[in-house]
């Protein structure tokens, strides 16, 4: 039987690692007492969550399983019909996203790694979901070229108001130069229609030797993307190497610099580039050195914690907390570390339809936790 495990008051710890041009404050949340309530435990490398219209929840496991949580109970049998994934290191099943017309058509979108050790990549498929099984699997995107590394896939997805789909595609680690090449999907955010076709207003449509699905480029390992309806902005975050994790505001056709500019160094300590700025390349709105290893992303618009309205929440794998970023007109003005008392790697963070925050902890014995107001 699961019990409420923590009661705490949000307290800021430090703000020495975030870098932006504008000065920021170290924040705390007076009166933001919270309780952290276990929702599901004993999960096998949980990666993300999907909230369903009927109040149930899909829990996506990297191993290729989708678990259904209904009325507080995780179904012992995973969703049937999930396509085969390439499960190795960071490869596996990443996200499940509901079609904008899911109530009418029952369509979902899955992002996952596919292929073999020598040839693998990020794939997106759509399928029909009847509440228990997937059927009518239709592959709508395969990142090109394939690669021989089991890391840096990206695979986060979000729909825009025009019903086009954005998908993050990582640089493949050993292929970082591809992030600057417009004939490759690696290190890019791509934008496609629901059937996989390319929107006519994509920024590079009509150019020779350019993949028309590319929406932005110069990215590394993107583990979070979201669309803010209030501002119309697309926010994305990505891992640096040793330092240089970033939050960016994404605009079509823009170059976000990797690996020509970076605020980090290589894992060996070697310099990746002499540049932190370069003409024609965008600066992050926020970067972290040393790295926090960001994963999962939500912009809070719930009612349970009104003092956090409009703030960004970023899961931190290495730092083992959730980072709250106070945003004003697209600029960070302060940060706060939350939920570090868990001592867990945070793989995903979402805002639920009930207005609570939901956290996914990483690993072979992962969990889903709900953050509720407390004393």
Set out the residue ranges of the language-model regions.
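Conserved blade-ending motifs and adjacent loop-strand segments that build the rim/top face
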Residues: 219, 332-353
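Beta-propeller fold detector
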Residues: 37-40, 75-83, 133-142, 196-204, ...
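Beta-propeller blade signature
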Residues: 123-132, 181-195, 250-251
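Short, conserved, GDST-rich strand-edge loop motifs in beta-rich repeat architectures
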Residues: 167-186, 244-246, 250, 368
């Amino acid at each position: 039987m699961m019990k409420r495990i923590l009661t705490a008051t949000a307290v800021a710890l430090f703000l020495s690692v975030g870098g932006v041009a504008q000065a920021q404050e170290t924040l705390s949340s007076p009166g933001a007492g919270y309780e952290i309530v276990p929702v599901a435990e004993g999960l096998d490398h949980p990666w993300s969550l999907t909230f369903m219209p009927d109040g149930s929840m899909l829990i996506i496991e990297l191993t290729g399983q989708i678990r259904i949580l209904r009325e507080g109970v995780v179904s012992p049998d995973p969703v049937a019909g999930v396509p085969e994934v390439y499960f190795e290191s960071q490869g596996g099943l990443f996200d499940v996203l509901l079609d904008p017309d899911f109530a009418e058509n029952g369509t979902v979108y899955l992002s996952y790694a596919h292929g073999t050790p020598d040839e693998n990549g990020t794939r997106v498929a759509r399928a029909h979901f009847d509440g228990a099984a997937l059927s009518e699997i239709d592959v709508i995107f395969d990142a090109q070229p394939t690669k021989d590394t089991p890391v840096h896939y990206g695979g986060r997805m979000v729909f825009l108001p025009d019903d086009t789909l954005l998908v993050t595609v990582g640089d493949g680690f050993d292929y970082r130069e591809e992030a600057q090449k417009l004939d490759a999907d690696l290190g890019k955010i791509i934008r496609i229609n629901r059937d996989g076709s390319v929107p006519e207003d994509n920024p590079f449509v009509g150019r020779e030797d350019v993949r028309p699905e590319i929406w932005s480029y110069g990215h590394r390992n993107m583990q979070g993307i979201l669309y803010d309806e209030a501002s119309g902005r697309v926010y994305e975050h990505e891992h640096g190497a040793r330092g240089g994790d970033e939050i960016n505001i994404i605009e079509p056709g823009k170059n976000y610099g990797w690996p020509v500019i970076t605020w980090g160094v290589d894992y060996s300590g070697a310099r990746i580039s002499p540049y932190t700025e370069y003409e024609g390349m965008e600066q992050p709105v926020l970067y972290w050195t040393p790295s926090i290893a960001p994963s999962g992303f939500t912009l809070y618009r719930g009612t349970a914690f009104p003092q956090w309205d409009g703030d960004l929440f970023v899961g931190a794998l290495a730092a083992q907390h959730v980072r709250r970023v106070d945003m004003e007109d697209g600029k960070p003005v302060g940060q706060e570390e939350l939920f570090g008392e868990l001592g867990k790697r945070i793989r995903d963070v979402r805002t639920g339809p009930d207005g609570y925050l939901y956290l996914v902890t990483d690993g072979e014995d992962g969990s889903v936790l709900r953050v509720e107001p407390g004393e």
